[in-house]
């Protein structure tokens, strides 16, 4: 049955307007994005099939262009639209991070770093450069490596921190394996970076390891 023939309270668009987006299921949200279904199936039916095919909403959102375009009802136009929406969401979070003290909004930092790093197929080491009020100056992905690791050079980190006139930094890197547990190498390089930056009076506030849906803080573990 076409969605237009459903009771108004059950139609995804009307439901969103009356109850808010959080009230919708993943399939209903995806159906709004798809806009139309196909012969014999509503957009919600197609959305449910896609979620089953990809294994959930997050794998669909993080799919490569080639993988995404294999989905029923999807294609290049939808892929471009989705990437634009995701980038707007990232920029919205980035703008929020420039307003206040990041230490008072740890969830914001974590959400931002997950969005930036978890989709990378190779290990990426990134730095948040902060001012003396812990507000974001810049986010930079400084080093990229293989699926097993990235070489990190303290001299380059110090150079970039000074260039941004940063008072503090937060490090982050992803584990493409999906496991966020820090390695001994992660702990060692963090301490080396802390020593190098300490020589120029720049504080290291944390080092976050991003896995598949989880994130570990070295500061919370007492390793800083």
UniProtKB/Swiss-Prot annotation:
Binding site for Zn(2+): 173, 175, 186
Signal peptide extent: none
An example Gene Ontology biological process: proteolysis
Start and end residues of each MPN domain: 102-224
GO molecular function (one): metallopeptidase activity
PROSITE patterns per the UniProt record, alphabetical: MPN (PS50249), UPF0758 (PS01302)
Keyword vocabulary terms for this entry: Hydrolase, Metal-binding, Metalloprotease, Protease, Zinc
One Pfam short name: UPF0758_N
Family: Belongs to the UPF0758 family.
Xref: PANTHER family: DNA REPAIR PROTEIN RADC, UPF0758 PROTEIN YEES-RELATED
Protein name in UniProt: UPF0758 protein CJA_3522
């Amino acid at each position: 049955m076409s969605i237009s023939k459903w009771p108004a309270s059950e139609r995804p668009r009307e439901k969103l307007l009356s109850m808010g987006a959080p009230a919708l299921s993943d399939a209903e949200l995806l159906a709004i994005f798809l806009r139309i279904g196909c012969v014999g199936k509503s957009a919600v039916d197609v959305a449910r099939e896609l979620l089953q095919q990809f294994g959930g909403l997050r794998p669909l959102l993080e799919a490569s262009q080639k993988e995404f375009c294999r989905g029923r009802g999807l294609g290049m136009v939808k892929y471009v639209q989705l990437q634009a929406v995701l980038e707007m969401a990232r920029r919205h979070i980035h703008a929020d991070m420039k307003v206040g003290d990041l230490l008072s909004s740890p969830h914001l930092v974590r959400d931002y770093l997950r969005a930036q790093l978890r989709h990378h197929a190779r290990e990426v080491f990134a730095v948040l450069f902060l001012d003396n009020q812990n507000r974001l100056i810049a986010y930079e992905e400084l080093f990229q490596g293989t699926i097993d690791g990235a070489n990190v050079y303290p001299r380059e980190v110090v150079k970039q921190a000074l260039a941004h006139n940063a008072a503090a930094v937060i490090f982050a890197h992803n584990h493409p394996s999906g496991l966020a547990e820090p390695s001994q190498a992660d702990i060692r390089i963090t301490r080396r970076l802390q020593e190098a930056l300490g020589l120029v009076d720049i504080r290291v506030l944390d080092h976050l390891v991003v896995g598949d849906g989880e994130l570990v803080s070295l500061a919370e573990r007492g390793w800083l």
